[in-house]
Structures are given as C-alpha cells and as structure tokens.
C-alpha cells in the first residue's frame, strides 16, 4: 500500500502510513572551441544518494515530475524506506530539508547528488513520522509539503534531503539519508533528442542462429530494445552487422529474428547506420585511413550451417565483390542515413576532418561528438548541440545528460530510474532555455524496456526525434 498525506502544519507533520509493510524491490549555446585532448568522461552520472548508517536500511526521496518544481506550489514527492535487514526497524522520523541557495553549476549538482560534497546550509520543511517496518519490508509514502513551507525559490537547482532517525529509546541506532534536487525552470525547458544504439555483441564474428534466437525471443535483449523505442521519438543508431547476421542465414534464420528485422525497418524513427560491428572510426582516422573499413564480401561468413567460418573478429576492407558472393546490400538498413558517424571517446580536429569524408564514395559526414571533447564541456559546462570543428560540421551530445539518461535506461526499477531522471533534469537546467539538447545513450547490449522508453520520452517535449532539429 501507499499512503498519501498532505502536510498541514510547517516543520512538524504526522503522515499516516500503511498498516502493513509493502515488500517490493527498490533500486533506486556556446561558441565551439576546437576539440582538446581531454580524457573522456567515463564516470557514471551522479544519482540521488541513499546513504545508510548500517547495513540493510535504504531511504529514497523522489520529487514528482522528475524534480521539476514551480515556486509557490505544493511539493509532492514519493518517500520510500526499505529495510533489507533480517530484523525489524523501529519507528522513527524522516526530516525533510531544503537548501535555499541554488547549486552553482553542474559540478556542484553532481557533487551534491553523489554525496562527495558536504551538505550546504539546509532548512527544515517538514517531518514524516514512520511506524515499525518489518524485516525485508518496504514502506512508501506520498508526501505533500505546502508551498508556504517550501518558500519562494528563484530559478535554479536546489539541494533537497531526507534524513531518517530512529525514535524509540533503546532500539538499535538507525539512520539514513537521501539526496535529491528540486529544479525551478528559468523559461521554456530544453528538449532532448536521444540517440539509442541498437547493438548486440556476438561470441564470434557475426551473431549465430542460436544467439539470434535468444536475442529476438519475447524476453530477448534485442526485442527489449525495439519494445523500448517503439512509439518514442528515439533516433536509432543500428549496427549493420545484426542485419547482416540475419540475412546471411537465409532460410536458416530464426523466424523471430526475421520478424525482428521487419519490425525494425517498419518503425518510423529516424535512424542511421553505425560502422559494421560498431567499429570505432576514431581509431581508423588516427591510423590515417582515408576511408572507413567496410565488409563488401559476405562469402566468408557463410558456413554449411549458416554460421560464420572466418576467424577474423574485425571488419576487413575489400576492393571488389567476388562472383557468387552475397550482395553488399546484405547489411543495408531500410531508411537509414549513411552520413552520420558516432565515434567513441575523444577526438582531435585532424581526426574530425578525416572522418568528414567517410561517407559513401567519399561523401561528407557529420560526426556526433561528446561535449567533453570541447573546452567548455570538459569543464562541465553545457555545449550547443550543433557546431563545427575546423570547418567540419559536428553534432554534440551532452555528456552529463547522456550519462544520466543512460543510467535511467538501464533500470527496470522505477525508483532507481526516477533518481537518474532527476539527475538528467538537474543537468538540463544549465542548457539554454528552449534549446534542443542531443543525448547519446551508452552502448549496451541489454536495457530495460521501461527504462529505455522513459529515458527517451522524459524530456522530448513530445517532439519528433530528428538530428536536423
């Protein structure tokens, strides 16, 4: 059960709780400078923290609307207390505290959420009384704090904390805290176009029939990826080796895989082709290749049972297609753009220039780069989604927003997903109001269907996902 209570007096409120414990799982525009050789941002996005003082106790506070708050309105949030211990938890109090000074920048937001920064000055805005919680039990309360108790807040991102303290004298000392944020908009919110990589790592060169059967089964990872993006404005970045693996099998291809491919190509989403096997174009440009590696001859992939026979684990360039070979369209994806590259990691200006000619027949391309490739982005600032490097047009994926949405996409648990979305919203505040932000989800073979859908739609503004927006 979930109890819903409106706080009726400032600072000291009693909220009725469900009589029985609920046992559930809880997880919780700027001018562009030339890219600089800074390290790639590889640390996970900070999420609202749940810090227990003893093993087994977790506290989560998740403001509604992904943390978005209108000054003067009631603050509504979900408060979850989970007791993973084998003994019951005594009654206590959850103190709600709000910082009145907005966090200065993204780094300050990240440090607050991940617990690496000391708490700033916080003011109490309410107390929630908790009852005894059984071992391995979870209680969940909808909290409503009147706007008068929250107070007026100027646009900004504000630290919000919940602290649990045991009340009963003589009971084991128990405490925990949860850090989160309130986001007060400064104008029209930024909208996010999210690029979703559709990939699957094979054990060999190409996915085998056995692997495809598992991946495209009702509970398979590739099925979950299509389920997650269906009906959303996601931009799809598809590894053509998946398509090739299905087509080279011919009549030996699993029926579920054939149906999956048909479904993929029927989706209305904008999509582009990754390099074959998601090969990294940065490394190829660094090696001085004037054209990207490609697989033009699929004959080596055809074995007696329709499985790959070549031991070569990486794409190899060929100059001609031998007679009798499978046509080069084997890896073609219906409706996919071929003028977009998504290199991994950081790049140099020279590499961007080289990759700008990696299109078909030496045609032009546009690379998607992480914002950390740029001076401002490396310092934690927001960077415009469009720009140029040395005369080459580029798209820029916001690294902080991408990391937070990637964390959300990986979560099947609503509480954990909600925390990641609050982080994304807090980071988005620092983008220009009304701007379009590009986010690129991390490459991952498995994602939660619910998490992926939520990550794509949470900040899309209901608009179509297109790279030319």
Model region roles, listed by residue range:
Residues 230-345, 349-351, 358, 392, ...:
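Metal-dependent polysaccharide deacetylase catalytic core of the NodB/CE4 family, i.e.
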Residues 44-59:
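Proline/serine/threonine-rich low-complexity linkers at boundaries of modular beta-sandwich domains
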Residues 178-266, 270-273:
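Active-site beta->alpha N-cap acidic-glycine motif
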Residues 149-160:
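Short glycine/proline/serine/threonine-rich loop/turn segments at secondary-structure transition edges
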Residues 81-88:
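Asparagine-centered strand-capping/turn motif at beta-strand->loop junctions
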Residues 97-121:
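Short aromatic-acidic-glycine turn motif
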Residues 1-41:
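Secretory targeting and sorting signals
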Residues 82, 227-228, 234, 320-469:
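Catalytic grooves of carbohydrate-active enzymes
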């Amino acid at each position: 059960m979930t109890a819903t209570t409106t706080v009726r007096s400032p600072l000291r409120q009693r909220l009725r709780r469900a009589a029985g414990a609920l046992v559930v799982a809880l997880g919780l525009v700027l001018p562009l400078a030339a890219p600089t050789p800074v390290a790639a941002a590889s640390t996970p996005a900070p999420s609202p923290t749940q810090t227990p003082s003893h093993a087994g106790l977790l506290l989560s506070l998740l403001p509604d609307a992904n943390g978005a708050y209108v000054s003067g309105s009631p603050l509504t949030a979900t408060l979850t207390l989970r007791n993973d211990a084998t003994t019951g938890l005594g009654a206590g109090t959850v103190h709600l505290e709000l910082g009145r000074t907005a966090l200065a920048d993204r780094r300050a937001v990240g440090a607050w959420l991940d617990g690496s920064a000391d708490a700033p000055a916080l003011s109490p805005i309410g107390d929630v009384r908790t009852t005894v919680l059984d071992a391995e039990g979870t209680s969940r309360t909808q909290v409503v704090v009147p706007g008068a108790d929250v107070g007026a807040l100027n646009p900004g991102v504000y630290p919000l904390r919940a602290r649990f303290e045991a009340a009963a004298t003589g009971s084991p000392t128990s405490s925990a805290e949860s850090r989160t944020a309130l986001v007060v908009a400064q104008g029209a919110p930024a909208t996010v176009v999210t690029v979703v990589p559709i990939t699957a790592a094979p054990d060999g060169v190409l996915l085998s029939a056995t692997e495809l059967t598992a991946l495209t089964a009702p509970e398979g990872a590739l099925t979950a990826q299509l389920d997650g993006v269906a009906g959303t404005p996601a931009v799809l970045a598809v590894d053509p080796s998946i398509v090739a693996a299905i087509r080279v099998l011919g009549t030996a291809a699993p029926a579920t895989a054939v149906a999956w491919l048909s479904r993929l190509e029927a989706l209305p989403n904008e999509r582009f082709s990754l390099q074959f096997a998601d090969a990294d174009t940065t490394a190829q440009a660094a090696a001085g290749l004037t054209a990207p590696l490609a697989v033009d001859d699929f004959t080596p992939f055809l074995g007696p049972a329709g499985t790959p026979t070549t031991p070569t684990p990486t794409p190899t360039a060929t100059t001609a297609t031998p007679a009798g070979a499978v046509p080069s369209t084997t890896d073609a994806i219906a409706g996919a753009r071929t003028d977009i590259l998504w290199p991994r990691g950081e790049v140099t200006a020279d590499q961007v220039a080289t990759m700008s000619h990696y299109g078909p027949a030496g045609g032009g391309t546009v690379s998607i780069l992480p914002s950390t490739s740029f001076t401002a982005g490396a310092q934690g600032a927001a960077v415009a989604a469009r720009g140029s490097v040395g005369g080459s047009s580029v798209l820029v994926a916001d690294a902080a927003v991408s990391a937070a949405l990637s964390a959300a996409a990986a979560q099947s648990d609503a509480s954990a997903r909600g925390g990641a979305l609050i982080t994304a919203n807090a980071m988005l505040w620092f983008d220009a109001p009304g701007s379009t932000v590009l986010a690129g989800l991390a490459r991952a073979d498995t994602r939660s269907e619910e998490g992926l859908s939520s990550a794509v739609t949470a900040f899309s503004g209901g608009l179509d996902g297109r790279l030319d927006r």
